[in-house]
Amino acid sequence: MSMNSNSVGAMWSKNVTFNNGEILLAGIPASTLAREFGTPTFFLDEDAFRSRAIAWRDGLKSEFGDRAGHVFYASKAFTCTAVAHWISEIGIGMDVATGGELAAALAGGVNPSKIQVHGNNKSLAEIDRAVSIGVNTIVMDSLYEIDRVAEAARKHGKRQAVLIRLTPGIEAHTHESISTAHEDVKFGFSIASGAAWAAVEKIAQLPDLELRGVHCHIGSQIFGTDAFEIAADRLLAFMAKYRDTYGTQLPELDLGGGYGIAYIEGETTVEPEDVLPTLGASVRTACAKYSLDIPAISIEPGRNIVGPTMFTLYEVGTVKDVVIEDGSIRKYISVDGGMSDNARTALYGAEYIAKIAQRTSTAPTAQSRLVGKHCETGDIIIRDIQLPSDVVPGDLIATPATGAYGRSMASNYNHVPRPPVVAVIDGKARVIVRRETEADLLALDVAKM
């Protein structure tokens, strides 16, 4: 699909404006940002981030009232101590999947009672730390893990609250790599195979564990509500079976995240009001169907909060005209970043738009490919895009909607230092994650031949 560089709208955060073709974030021109912070750099609209997190917090409360559980920000999308601090100020929780994500949450001031621990292969050290500090819940993902968490709880003299991650057998129509609730995946316990019920029976025999509820995550970049509705029904049916067997109802239901955002023309970003009323109706219908009280409902938006709030700013280094098989010319526009700061195109075939960031252009557009500086043919940021034919070295190029899985999946391929993250609000910009240096990379080397 060929992207149009003149698109402005759902892909850009709410405080991005345009003046004579130049991008401004909270009133600061892109050229000024580039001079002060260099390129490539992730620029984060802090006001937009806060607003989106608050919207999910308030939306959950509005829909479910006193049955609203937690909004857990999915920190895998992007985290750092500043983001964790904002989350703490806003009053929502964080979901973490590694010791590093837990460390960032704690360093940012998130109360352990608002931290939920995920992951399909938690280490013994990660489990021990989570139990010792009193996290909200640990989401069980294997029978081995149930024993490990119980052992850690005994060691620390605690009764650890846990959820069971269920795979309800749903095909959420998204990329295979980010679809997580069908049967053939590494995550969770299958309802259909009986594995989920075996996990329930195992936990019931361990007094050091408190089974608080069930969880599922059906995938990412989901725009419809059908899959969420089916998931809610299947999980509540499972909870009804638990009640019928054990004589008590599990108090919590976590329906995960996965709410889509706009990356290209024709896409829209899912807002809380687009999904929560339907989700609420589905939960109430299923609870009536199975004669259940409405449990506390939790959700886990990550990409949907941070994704639309960032753009990446690059500088063009070279432009090359290449004659392709059909005889036409494709411009290869090489920038000073690439797959080391945005791996999603290579991993998932993800699509983006891009725009000259510091000037306007009246030149006709040209068939273009935006590529990085790495020694890899697949180092492509945007495979097909119509960009002005007068793009030259020194131009700034911005790609929006890079807040999720950009910096968090960044690498040091070709020994390239990772870019910084700069938060901008009310006309002021500050670094919240500094740019790596070559000295940082070399500092990890501990031996010489």
What label would you give each PLM region?
Residues T278, R284, A288, L292-M449:
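Charged (often Lys/Glu-rich) extended helix/loop segments that serve as interaction or gating elements
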Residues E63, N111-S113, H156-K158, L206-L209, ...:
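Secondary-structure transition/capping motifs at alpha-helix termini
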